[in-house]
């Protein structure tokens, strides 16, 4: 339960102070190689790879490859990740008949931008996500050397 509480704690105050000079890094689009951040700094990938719809596009089937690649890159550059979690997945939103919304991040983002319909499914996703990158030695990403300690929900 502590892990869930940590996730739900939001670092909204960082939004206004994050810039390239800040130790908290900057909001970056991870597809742009030069915007992945400098060595030895904080990075805040935005929207980043921590999108529920991308990781669990089908209920119960988790795709970690893109997130793992980002974490490995950050480890190689001694970066501290402040991960932004996006709590939307199409299959969950369809279950409660949410209306579609236009995403500011294009097609790689979900079609729906409402709160999760099933909090149990969302809790399961959050638990698996944090457990994979928490560095406690149980269910961790293979090769994890620098755990993610700071999480932001939707920024």
Describe each PLM feature range.
Residues 4-14:
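Sec-dependent N-terminal signal peptides
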Residues 16-20:
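Sec/Tat signal peptide C-region and signal peptidase I cleavage site
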Residues 21-155:
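N-terminal substrate-binding region of glycoside hydrolase catalytic domains
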